[in-house]
């Protein structure tokens, strides 16, 4: 029906990755791009959802949400700010990874009850590695707080254009491995440790 819609029909196809759609579908579509919400709008959405954040939580969660009210709610409900801080703190020990800290964090994901947190961890690692690659190309982000621990990490790991490419490849590889591993019910603790070791290997090689 999407490729050959009936006469006088209007169909809405919503996609967060339109480039991944089949060309036969895209050629029949008129694009209507929806921009991300501003941080103020995300905060308003959280208030409407009766989710109240502290002054310390609010800026980080709205930034990590990337303009998505749904992602902001998810981050708030799953203590995403605390998980993000734990990841940044552990990765800040690179290129000589604190393996005890990595193991402790990985073991907190044992069991089926942590399935949603594991999905969130994948999203946060995607963000962290993506920002690391971006910083390798554009070292100074005028909107970022240079004193924040995550910004110090991105600056510490950036190694120019070559580093940007390597971090982007590591991000893609880790994301695929983690998502596939969960789909086939591999041990999340093992997957997370493997993730940390791959990141450590990349950091040591640059």
Labelled PLM ranges:
Residues 7-10, 16-124, 131, 135-206:
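Charged, glycine-rich active-site and insertion segments that engage polyanionic ligands
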